[in-house]
Amino acid sequence: VNWCPSDQTVLANEQVVDGCCERCGAEVEVRELEQWFLKITDYADRLLEDLDTVDWPENVKTMQRNWIGRSEGAEVVFTCDELGTEYPVFTTRPDTLFGATFFVLAPEHPDVLRLAEGTGNEQAVAEYVKEALARGSDLRGAAEREKTGVALGRTVTNPVNGEQIPVFVADYVLMEYGTGAIMAVPGHDERDYAFAKAFDLPIRRVIEGDNPDGDADGLPYAGDGVLVNSAPQFDGQPNREALKEIVVWLESEGKGKLAVNYRLRDWLISRQRYWGCPIPIVRCPECGIVPVPNDQLPVMLPVIEDYAPQGQSPLAAATDWVNTECPNCGGPAERETDTMDTFVDSSWYFLRYCDASNDEAAWDPAILREWMPVDQYIGGVEHAILHLLYARFFCKALADLGHLDVDEPFARLFTQGMITRDGAKMSKSRGNVVSPKAIVDRYGADSARAYILFIGAPDQDADWSDEGVEGVHRFLSRLWRLSAEVADHDAAGAPVGDEAANTELIRKANWAIEKVTGDMDRRFAFNTAIAAVMELVNEVSRLRDSAGLDAQRFALETASSLCFPFAPHVTTDAYHLLTGEQLWEQPWPTADAATLERDTYELVCQVNGKLRDRVEVASDASKEQLEAAAMAAPNVQVHLDGREPNKVIVVPGKLVNIVVG
């Protein structure tokens, strides 16, 4: 199992990242311990197939598919004739079997030390295994690592050609994938090739193909081609066709069979910590391992004085709690002292939320039928192969046991990004943490809140910028100032304004309603929603002298309503200034579709990316007509100064950018 020397506890495979503990960063070791597992592998296919039934981000689905890692291939049996033992190997490339020139076992393989007995290599093998187990599997499996290993002094028989090939123990082979044993084909596998070179082992080509990046012989070659140096009945065939025939032949000879393998391993839930749910098991000298009966659940944690990590569970010291009676025979027994990984609790907490006050059961099935599955779940992508996978497994297992009517917990998933600073995750150790109090004291809570939502797409990481907060602060100040100015006008004597300006401002306000509502509804695109309100406020500023007071008032009321979720304080006050009413009592605005229809629109005209003019154009104008209108704009003509454009970029409905040298 994976062992964290800092936290003094075991870790699930999913909690090891690049060979280190995902919680504290310590380099993970491998130890042999008796631990408890949940058999998540029984659900591997369903966990894969049902990803197609949920509305989740594709990257999260891909991460789960890769973690489950379903592979179709063959199980081939190699035999150590000296000891009479068989060693099955899973391979997705049975077409390369004739190229196997050595055999490798993972350091954790139970037969490594036994195979070395009596060969004179016992000590070297034992020392190598000890060193290898101190390294995490994430680091060991890296393709770029220097290959190390020790010969066991034994050979096994290659079942397809009868060759005796030497057996090694090497840490680049992982026990958690396949059977912990591999047939090494250095001519067609990069890691096997590196090992063969390091130990001067034979390298044989069995697939003919072109590899300009290989050695002088074009090896290692991992592509497709035709079989060579294999067997007369297979040589000359395309390797993908021969692959199927080789498996059929192996089955007929009793030397192999079709097989499916998974990268996923059973979930190790034992933890040597105090804080966790006690594992409800007792150990009886007479009855063995006995589950705690339902009427004695839950097993409660005892009160202890010292729960610091000690290499074994702190509960082991609570002898009054450990010593108990066997539920079967009534004799003396001991409780299991490991506790469950806290991911066990987070795998079903959402079910308890539906019926949190129930003192008789975890939940009432009728209540869960009404509430489950969760319609919208929000969480970090870092939980893709941890909490999100475990929760799916729990729901499927509980459904199979008759406790649930649904087997997928979360119908829709949204994964939020992280706000970084100077390109790095904020942390006290890096000294790059932004103080919320300092931001609020300087710019106000609304500016801080709105900027966090405006900083970028909510599902992407974004870098913090103090200048960005200032920009949002200026926008909110402008909204307040314009609202105060309009509110100060006497409505009775207010100017009617230019009809075209009024129409444009009302249209812009309704466009903002439609845009913000759509962005917030399902996409959570708060950044573009805020940008739309900014556009509306900018339009009020631009048309301040030409639009009538009623149009300006409507636009500013709309801006306050739309910005209320992002900046509730200033918008509440601005709306009250304009209307005398409380904003939180108002319904969400709805767009008037009729105002959004128009025969013309204002085309932005740029020269070298800078705004130089605006012209009114027909809504159905072609790209050629838009280019001609922009070229004829008076201020564009001034800045062109007789020069011919190098390039003209036309974006219908928005702008024309004329590029000149």
Regions found by a protein language model. Name each.
Residues 1-7, 70, 258-287, 389, ...:
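Helix-rich, typically C-terminal accessory recognition domains appended to large enzymatic cores
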Residues 1-208, 310, 314, 325, ...:
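NTP-handling and nucleic-acid-processing catalytic cores
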Residues 1-87, 181-298, 307, 312-317, ...:
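Residue patterns forming the tRNA-binding/recognition surfaces of aminoacyl-tRNA synthetases
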Residues 11, 28, 51, 55, ...:
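A generic secondary-structure signal for well-formed alpha-helical elements
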Residues 60-65, 91-224, 255, 259-267, ...:
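Structured ligand/cofactor/substrate-binding pocket environments in proteins
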Residues 179, 616-642, 646-653, 657:
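Glycine-rich, small/acidic residue-mixed loop/short-helix segments
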Residues 221-229, 354-375:
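Residues forming anionic-ligand binding surfaces in small-molecule and nucleic-acid pockets
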Residues 308-344:
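Acidic, glycine-rich two-metal-ion catalytic cores of nucleic acid-processing enzymes
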